[in-house]
Amino acid sequence: MVRSQLPVAAPLRLLCALLLLPSATMIPGGLSPRSVTDPDVQEAAAFSVQEYNALSANAYYYKELRIVEAQSQVVSGAKYYLTMELMKTKCAKATSKPKVYKEIQNCELPPKAQQEKLTCHFQVWSRPWLEKMELTKMSCN
């Protein structure tokens, strides 16, 4: 008795097609590249700059120069992995109310010879339904 190979061939083709999909779509919770202009990335970056300035012992504010790279991961919410360049400003940290992100971004830069640039890696955990963001990791050099 001769059997048709058609029923076996269709599932095999489907399996091959699935194997050709990009790996990020097949790994739940895996890192995915994000556009640095994405509004969620911009929000996480602004939060990172504010937190950096709140936690650092620097006498002057540092502002965002640019977002070099952004990735995200779906967790209970979203985790953003950001590589950013920050630049020291002329705005001294006062003992009064700390500046917010938009105010920091308006701070002037010192003359070229006195500029200090940092490359920072931030991890930000966002849970929009709780209206909460948390800086889970930060390293700058």
Curated annotation (Swiss-Prot):
**Which region is the signal sequence?**
1-26
The record's section on Pfam families has:
Cystatin
Query: Where does this polypeptide localize?
Result: Secreted
Q: Any keyword Signal? A: yes
Expressed in which tissues: Expressed at a low level by the venom gland (at protein level).
Q: Name one GO molecular function term.
A: cysteine-type endopeptidase inhibitor activity
**Principal localisation:** secreted
What are the alphabetically sorted keywords of the record? Disulfide bond, Protease inhibitor, Secreted, Signal, Thiol protease inhibitor
Q: Which InterPro entries match?
A: Cystatin_dom, Cystatin_sf, Prot_inh_cystat_CS
Q: Provide one Gene Ontology cellular component.
A: extracellular exosome
PROSITE patterns in the record: CYSTATIN
Residues covered by the Cystatin domain: 29-129
Q: Where is this motif: Secondary area of contact?
A: 73-77
Q: Where is this site: Reactive site?
A: G29
According to the lineage, what is the superkingdom? Eukaryota
Disulphides: C91-C107, C120-C140
Q: What else is known?
A: Negative results: the recombinant protein does not inhibit calpain-1 (CAPN1), a C2 family cysteine protease and legumain (LGMN), a C13 family cysteine protease. Does not provoke cell death (PC3 prostate cancer cells).
Q: Relate the protein's function as given in its record.
A: Inhibits various C1 cysteine proteases including cathepsin L, papain and cathepsin B. This protein has no toxic activity and its function in the venom is unknown. It may play a role as a housekeeping or regulatory protein.
- Identify its protein family: Belongs to the cystatin family.
- Write the protein's name: Cystatin
Species classification = Eukaryota, Metazoa, Chordata, Craniata, Vertebrata
